[in-house]
């Protein structure tokens, strides 16, 4: 854990954008872009010599291109050997940064789950309280009906319906 804190606190090892990475690599190994530029220039000169029908100059530029490519390859290998330990440290740092991001993402996901669980429990408690209150009210309503006679209940439930009103109208009864 102390190693991780040391690496994360080191200002040399910080997250960087692709442009920053390009600039850093350009500063670390300036010979590689120089070799690439020399190769491109030799190819350009060979092309121009071919257009001018100067085969001697064209062959000389193709040889120069081969030398420039060899120089570039040598710069890549030498730079790789020279910066081997730093690249290894950077890879370890990037791995730790990814682990930290994954852990933060996991923690955020767990916090979200806990919040949803708390919300669900609150909803269930409110729902249970409402159902208990509803049960108490229905029990209170049942207690009121227990003291009444059953015939009164039937009379109350039976009212004048549409059919009764039509029959009464046909028979000529007035209410």
Curated annotation (Swiss-Prot):
Keywords: Coiled coil, Membrane, Mitochondrion, Transmembrane, Transmembrane helix. The keyword Transmembrane applies. One of its GO terms (cellular component) is mitochondrial membrane. Pfam families: HIG_1_N. Residues 3-94 form the HIG1 domain. Cytochrome c oxidase subunit which plays a role in assembly of respiratory supercomplexes. This is Respiratory supercomplex factor 1-B, mitochondrial. It comes from Talaromyces marneffei (strain ATCC 18224 / CBS 334.59 / QM 7333) (Penicillium marneffei).
